[in-house]
């Protein structure tokens, strides 16, 4: 995503020594794919709150998402967004980009962590071939996401419960044996995924959504008790558990609800706003 592409959005001002950190999943959490008048108003209300109070309350806002930066930007345009967050941790938290009036910049420390990993497309292809030839497990490429250096996406088509359990265990075991991280969760058709499928995302070890929380809190010296996270799906739960206040939004998936009990009353940005208003003080 080039700098000129972000010029249609406002940036939040730099927060000196932030007190609070707010981590939000993007698809079906901050951004409702089924755009309605109600969801537009809820988004505007949250944006207004963040813009009005991020300086006096010292709030650092970030989106932690499986989507790429270019995909996030396209959805922002479609959804009528006005403001970029302070940072986007895109491609499932394998890259961090900060936004300010001066432009955008990648986090070099995070990039160095990725470069130190042994992640490679060849290793992932080797895992995929072994799954196919030895276990007859087919992974279908998610071609709509394009190319990413540090994240490779597949779908696993669900069968029956016992078959799925064996297949997912095999995927996790092979990833572990190859020194590669893997994120697996049920697809959400509301976010454009197919029915009866799992997302299978290969990423470097020590990256992904929960590691973004640890990294940002440490980098900005923010107390964990002053951190908030919001999500809607199973792949958000580990991120929620890393913060002092982790919530599923009201429209969360059944899988996510079975894994995490703390929920907002409202859906999407309405749920985020209700929590921030209740907890964030000067």
What are these regions (language model features)?
Residues 130-228, 235-238, 242:
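Conserved acidic, metal-coordinating active-site core of Asp-based
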Residues 1-26, 30-34, 45-52:
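Non-catalytic pre-domain segments flanking phosphatase-related domains
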Residues 3-6, 41-142:
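Active-site phosphate-binding/coordination module
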Residues 30-38, 200-204:
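Glycine-rich phosphate-binding "P-loop"
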Residues 99-110, 198-201, 278-282:
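Short, surface-exposed amphipathic charged segments that create phosphate/polyanion-binding patches used
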Residues 20-22, 86, 227:
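The start of beta-strands in P-loop NTPase/AAA+ ATPase cores
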Residues 22-29, 91-93, 146, 155-157:
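Short loop/turn segments at strand-loop or loop-helix junctions that form parts
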Residues 4, 17, 203-282:
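Mg2+-dependent phosphoryl-transfer enzymes with acidic/Ser/Thr/Gly-rich catalytic loops
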């Amino acid at each position: 995503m080039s700098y000129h592409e972000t010029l249609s959005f406002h940036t939040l001002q730099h927060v000196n020594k932030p007190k609070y950190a707010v981590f939000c999943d993007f698809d079906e959490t901050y951004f409702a794919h089924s755009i309605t008048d109600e969801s537009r108003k809820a988004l505007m209300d949250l944006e207004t709150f963040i813009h009005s109070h991020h300086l006096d309350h010292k709030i650092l806002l970030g989106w932690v998402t499986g989507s790429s930066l270019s995909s996030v930007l396209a959805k922002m345009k479609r959804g009528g967004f006005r403001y970029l967050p302070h940072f986007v941790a895109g491609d499932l938290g394998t890259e961090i980009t900060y936004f300010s009036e001066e432009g955008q910049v990648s986090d070099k420390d995070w990039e160095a962590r990725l470069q130190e990993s042994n992640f490679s497309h060849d290793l992932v292809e080797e895992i995929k071939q072994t799954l196919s030839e030895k276990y007859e497990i087919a992974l279908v490429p998610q071609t709509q996401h394009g190319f990413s250096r540090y994240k490779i996406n597949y779908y696993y088509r669900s069968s029956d419960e016992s078959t799925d359990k064996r297949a997912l265990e095999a995927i996790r075991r092979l990833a572990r044996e190859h020194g590669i991280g893997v994120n697996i969760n049920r697809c959400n058709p509301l976010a454009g995924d197919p029915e009866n499928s799992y997302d299978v995302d290969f990423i470097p070890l020590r990256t992904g959504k929960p590691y973004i929380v640890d990294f940002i809190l440490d980098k900005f010296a923010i107390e964990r008790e002053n951190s908030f996270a919001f999500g809607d799906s199973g792949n958000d739960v580990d991120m929620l558990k890393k913060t002092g206040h982790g919530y599923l939004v009201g429209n969360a998936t059944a899988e996510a609800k079975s894994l995490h009990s703390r929920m907002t009353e409202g859906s999407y940005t309405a749920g985020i706003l209700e929590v921030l208003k209740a907890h964030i003080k000067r």
